[in-house]
Amino acid sequence: MNVRRIAPLLNHRAKRDTTILNYQFSIFHSYREERQQMFLNIVKADGTAEQAVIREMKARAAGARGDIEQIVRGVMADVQQRGWDAVVEYAERFDGKAPYIVEPKVLDDAYNACDPKLIAALEKAAANIRDYHEQMLVKTWEWNRAKGETLGQTVRGLSRVGIYVPGGTAAYPSSVLMNAIPAKVAGVGELIMVTPPTENMSNEVLAAAKIAGVDTVIAIGGTQAIAALTYGAGFIPQVDKIVGPGNAFVAAAKKLAFGTVDIDMIAGPSEVLVIADHTANPTYVAADLLSQAEHDKLASAVLLTDSMAQAQAISCEMERQAKLLPRWDIIKESV
């Protein structure tokens, strides 16, 4: 690499952030000396090369969808036919244990085990979400016109809603708040949260369920959880609507459930596109890309830049940060 070509980049930012510039220069120097393969697949857009990348990304997602939907369709049909026996069978196979209700005391203990600063942040977020959605609330109204005419609308919350909350190595307490609190504001009668059982269930997620006012938490995940909520099985009742994100299997199950129950949306793998010129901070850009890449092996994290030096700097910074994250194996697959 011709280091002289990046000298203007270093010089014009020197007064603003010498530390970042020195760090960037060390990355460029390391790359020049070691000539290591870039963490990111860097493609020069020429009208053809980028189209090949886009086709590859689409094909990867489409191929996975086809295989997954076939598996999910079989599980959904089996649960519909055999009910609770099928749910338990799949839960023991994929979750490692039969479904169970998480007792209120477990939620209380999880709440008390969390850092008080985290609890304060969750409660503040809950209050903000509640206040915002109260302003959006569609209300019942009636208009009495002349000659006995009465027009209007009646708005009622659904009787029962199921909330899917992802498990695994990542904790998503925000997902609990953003799904449960608007439902409470809307007047939903009963909230049932399902989340995969783990050896140590996330205290943050369980605390968020307590703060949001979730009525019942059930330890079950994956397609079998969506199937149980869709058709009702054992102590898991049928719901009117299923909301919340999940992996590709959960998304496919929600797609098949739609029509029997309502759903919020079919959420595909996470995608992010970051546009950054030479002035962008590689540390921040890398963090933005990784925040989506770590969600799923089929996630897509794409960077657009007009600076090859910047592309290489961000690639190196992504690799440095990624190796510090617990979902390193997933990130390697997604990028």
Where in the sequence are the language-model features?
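NAD(P)-dependent aldehyde/semialdehyde dehydrogenase
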Residues: L298-V335
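N-terminal Rossmann-like NAD(P)+-binding subdomain of aldehyde/semialdehyde dehydrogenases
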Residues: Q37-S159
